Amino acid sequence: MKFIKWSLVSVALCGLGLSAHAEVKIRSEVEDAYKWDFSLIYPSWDAWEADLAKVETIGDEIVALEGTLAEGPQQILKLEQLSDEIGKLAYRLYGYSGLQRDINLSDNDLLARWGQFMGAFQSMQQKLSWITPEMLSIPEATMMEWIDSTPELQIYRFPITETYRLQEHVLNAEGEKLLSYFSKMGTVPSGIYAAISTADAKPMPITLSDGENFEVTAGSYAMAMTTMRNQADRKLIQETLSQSIIDQKNTYAAIYDAALSSGWAEAQARNYESVLASQLDGDNVPMEVFTNLIETAKNAKETLRRYHHLRQKVLGLETYGWSDCMFPIVDDKTQYPFEDIKPRIISSVAPLGKAYQKELASLFENGQIDVYESVGKRTGAYSSGIYGIGPFVLLNYHDAMEDAFTLAHELGHSMHTQLSDANQPFATSDYTIFVAEVASTFNEKLFLGELLKEVTTPEQRIALLEHQIQDIIGTFITQTLFADFELKAHTLVESGETLTAERLTQIWRETTAEYYGDIIPADDPYMYSWARIPHFYNTPYYVYKYATCYASSSSIYKAIQTASSETEKAEIINRYLTLLSSGGNDFPIRQLQKAGVDLTKPEATENVVKELDRLVSELEAACAEL
């Protein structure tokens, strides 16, 4: 039974905050062509309220089925169809309230509407906690006979089969009801983390080397590390932000310990040997996928050393630390205006066929992209799909190279949603996070290829080469380092140890050295960064999927580029489009294998390390010509 895509809601709750850019327009000053059209979802709040009430009514119909599921296939069919109705409504209700909230985080009325939605569905989860235990009381062989003999049940075969696969980790009805009471308690650590790291965080004023006043926030820190060329200013900004963490390091450690302890308690209650085992089991991912990733990524240490030593040399820096790792080697001032980038992104996806290209182009015309920053708007970017309506993309576009790649990235997600929803019934339309980032990073690679065709200066080429390198470091190396740290921290909690700030900092320092060697000094403020990663507190063992997805998209892209014939290339592209159209109709590992990527073997991740080495060699050669 697919009830609601809670992963989508979780993503929407992560990383809320206001942008650090100055001179931001108010919402009314942004042209309508660059704003979401909410009438695509509902004509009014009255219509939204009516559907929210309808959810309660449908929920009561489902509750009335309690105790009747064993009567036959028609009862199962009724349950699944009613669940689909609630799920489809949930997407629309979430979209109308959540998306509007995200464009004005200071609007208390919108926050209240969002809370109304969340409250209704949390209550619904408790009322329907009996469903899985009752379904599992029916012998699996009987259920399969019912599905075989009832054509309308065929579309539910995979999700129902999944329920039986996981049955050893499902409690009886009373146990599931008891756990549902603690579901909100399990989110308390992440709520406290959001409060201390974002809601209660105050800007920290400093004076830069040129006398300019600067307010340090999480957002302005990220911007400064990638754009500010004065080393002393970057270091001051990093030290200022890090000091705010150091001052509360024991609080952050206590929150993280509570989050991990809560996850471990539920994993034990559900008969898992570890939190990692429980997280992998949800997608039926073999343990070797995780361990292969960690073992392989560490092999990039020497390449990372070469890259950062090159940066230090070209930039002429006597000392080198974390605050020197991210800003570009060359000061390329190329602008990427939104209107100029639109046709280039559309052109870049031509290899995927005219139908894909036309569908992507339509996303620019239908009020589905909220382009520019405005006062009160959530920072960052995402693509959020609403079944039956389509994807909605949030951006904070400022004409920078990173903004252009972010647009390509989010449109990759959006097209994944479009194709899955168009080709799958609601029950299997929801693709897993394990494959989600394949589509987004693949489209970034296509866009990069388009930009490389247009390079006119050595500086532009170096900027694009470095973008590729930083992309691999950020998406593959860093996320694997994060996952490695998580594994070590969870292992300590699961062995009975209480996490302290000193212990976490030690683990972070040791793990960083395993990937970066001596590039980052042991006393660098970066060593407290374990307190700054929201995913650690909100979604354990989430980040490794970024790395495996990157490896998967790289493997598919390379296969297309090196195909020996047009026929072979067409076959690879067709397998890839089939992956994008398959939603959640199979295990993600099997979906990727059908597309030509086997993550149970190390080849895909090893190829990323080789790609990084090749790019660093190209960058070394390009810099030698400056």
Q: How does the language model describe each region?
A:
Residues D430-Q460, Q468-Q470, G474, C549:
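Post-HExxH zinc-binding segment in Zn-dependent metallohydrolases
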Residues T334-Y336, I369-I389:
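Catalytic zinc-binding patch centered on the HExxH motif and its immediate surroundings
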Residues A12-S19:
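Hydrophobic h-region of N-terminal signal peptides that target proteins for export
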Residues M1-L8:
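Bacterial N-terminal signal peptides that target proteins for export
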Residues N271, H398-Q418, S440, K445, ...:
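Active-site recognition of the HExxH zinc-binding catalytic motif
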